[in-house]
Amino acid sequence: MSVDTATVAKIASLARIKVSEAELGAMVPELNGILAWVEQLGEVDVTGIEPMTAVIPNKQRLRDDVVNADPLTGGDMRDAVLANAPAPEHGFFGVPKVIE
């Protein structure tokens, strides 16, 4: 895949980046080089290789997910918190719809 000046201009417009005509000309070979490198990565044979999610092993030490019954520091305070809400709905905070 290769890009031309019109494609770079469209990408810049979609990304809301102001690019001059001189910069457009310089970006075309750079983007083509990046895309060629990505295509080259796609040609590597990775059959039998397990995907790596991290360079070093990550072990998360998780605590049990339990509700603390202490009224000052714990959970089980939903009713007390929702008592201050202007429009609670079904046990949750009611908010106005902002997306149609």
UniProtKB/Swiss-Prot annotation:
GO biological process, one term: translation
Paired cysteines (S-S): none
Domain of life per record: Bacteria
Reaction equation(s) it catalyzes: L-glutamyl-tRNA(Gln) + L-glutamine + ATP + H2O = L-glutaminyl-tRNA(Gln) + L-glutamate + ADP + phosphate + H(+); L-aspartyl-tRNA(Asn) + L-glutamine + ATP + H2O = L-asparaginyl-tRNA(Asn) + L-glutamate + ADP + phosphate + 2 H(+)
E.C. no: 6.3.5.-
UniProt entry keywords in alphabetical sequence: ATP-binding, Ligase, Nucleotide-binding, Protein biosynthesis
Ligase among keywords: yes
Single Gene Ontology MF annotation: asparaginyl-tRNA synthase (glutamine-hydrolyzing) activity
NCBIfam families linked: gatC
Subunit structure, as described in the record: Heterotrimer of A, B and C subunits.
Family: Belongs to the GatC family.
PANTHER family, per the entry: GLUTAMYL-TRNA(GLN) AMIDOTRANSFERASE SUBUNIT C, MITOCHONDRIAL
UniProt function note: Allows the formation of correctly charged Asn-tRNA(Asn) or Gln-tRNA(Gln) through the transamidation of misacylated Asp-tRNA(Asn) or Glu-tRNA(Gln) in organisms which lack either or both of asparaginyl-tRNA or glutaminyl-tRNA synthetases. The reaction takes place in the presence of glutamine and ATP through an activated phospho-Asp-tRNA(Asn) or phospho-Glu-tRNA(Gln).
Protein name: Aspartyl/glutamyl-tRNA(Asn/Gln) amidotransferase subunit C
